[in-house]
């Protein structure tokens, strides 16, 4: 039996995996197969190993194949000389998780007091891994008739890495509308009473321009 003029080809492919960040470890382990059937005969490639990356954080990690391939036939004979063995590294891809944050839309009739978010929770807060998240500070305020953003900022918790997330931040609207029944305000000019004494006397200004409502 002589060597083949044209060698058989075998490609060993390392396993790959693609997941979305969830705070847990993920792996890409081993290869798709070490066994190949050529012309009805089964062959096994030995001598190779994979790095088998295990990671938690978002990123791309290579599952490298290392070693020197040895090809054995079904009876265990070394037939490496009859083969060209190629390798393809795999990848562990952990994609960033998508987080959506949105403050609420709030409204009220004008009452002279600022409309703020207060203790109202975010309307939408989705995508954080279990045990991870953020704290929020609301700065939006609307007092007069009109509307403005229910503005807020966030600070990620100590155990939460920004690099593991793509965060979409949307602000709701604070709206103050006209009152159905208007307030009634009476402004009184100051009065004065005096007895004639040959001197000028005056009644100047108003009692007050300031009013407390509700």
Enumerate the language-model features and the residues they cover:
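Solvent-exposed beta-strand/loop surfaces, strongest in extracytoplasmic domains of secreted
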Residues: 1-214
